[in-house]
Amino acid sequence: MWNGFWRYRYLLWNLVSRDFKLKYRRSVLGVVWSVLNPLLMCLVYWAVFSSLMDMRGSGIDNFAVFLMCGQLLFNFFNEATSTGMSSVLGAAPLLKKVYIPKYIFPLEKCCFAMVNCVFSFVALALVMVFTGSPLHWTILEVLYPLVTLFFFSLGVGLFLAAATVFFRD
């Protein structure tokens, strides 16, 4: 199984870089959108939850950072599974012409979602600096849950991609 991943690593790299270029090709701000989008969403959620629902007195220190962490992980899971779900159907013309393992396409979408998530962590760092949250070496502990979420999202994406071939709704 690992031999198959290693054999198609260049194809995977080319597919991820193609998606990256296609996403930001016609955009004026380019990659800045990957940072700006989570920042603006966090600002809206923070305004709603802190003022309208009075979450300031809930005992959560640095509520904006707390909110941003959850938002980034959810956005990654959402993007990885929703794009992975339709990836095999989207690659059907290529799959009919050349033999490529079908798992490459959901894996590529999950890798691309991880690239976007890494850019979004810049937004988290900006929120941490703005709110005065301390940066500790323990921030490296986020790597294990992120890798676990990657594989979980990949599994869900593979399952949904297989189901979408039969049930296109």
Where are these regions (language model features)?
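Hydrophobic transmembrane alpha-helices and immediately adjacent juxtamembrane helices
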Residues: 1-168
